[in-house]
């Protein structure tokens, strides 16, 4: 699994690009290619081995390579949460991936919404792994894949639960907060369960296929949407990731789960352009395979199954370089970036 990270774009530039009323002041650190970023956690490139080889990490978020679908596993202190399971045909891969990590049971299983590319593989996961709680925005749907999801939940002696916005769950020493949906929608994508995951000073936002109407309502709800890492909604479709929403999240990194040469053209150029304007680093499963983000509560690391150039990840980026192999190391307390070779790094 490869490790890479490109230079971070200053938070004030991202805010200005999104036309905020005021710019934030930005200082400079005393190290080559360093900067001060207010209120931001910053990544470090890890040389660690891939997950699933016996390593122990305090917190990891895995974006599985399920093609034109979504499946995210969150691990903290030996507890696990599965958010979506890809398509039905992805079920065996999801189970194998979790087995290789040593997963024996799941504390929480979330179906973000009732479309097959999110709920389909959860039946296989529930057939193999015992779960404590299973959640979905609905308890009934007409599709066989959703009915199977309900069946395998009930075979464990559980019922599919419909959680409410504002619910908070512990996951080890991390917290998971349900932010949305905050209204009723006819559009199934907008019913997606939106979760904020906090571990120390690092934060992550899972949005399923939420589109612009639900994004607007979520912003207007006053929920705390600021996050370091954003799962870009609806596989990078132009129907999601509106300016108003991205303005509220201001992520350092956007993860897009989509299939190679998929028929929908995801991610759409409109979405890539918005992310580019905001200075968000884009990571895509169609180019990078599985993506693993680790956190020690202050810094986060990125590991990818494959490598790709910046120009491939966000292809119209005029400033894209050949490859992004060197990273920046940062600390949310000092708010400073350092090159890995910087002599001013703490021991």
Model feature map: region roles:
Residues 6-8, 18, 337:
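A general, composition-driven signal for non-globular sequence regions
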Residues 11-34:
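Sec-dependent N-terminal signal peptides of Gram-positive bacterial secreted proteins and lipoproteins
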Residues 21, 225, 235, 327-328:
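Alpha-helical interaction segments
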Residues 277, 312-347:
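Mature, structured domains enriched in cysteine- and short glycine motifs
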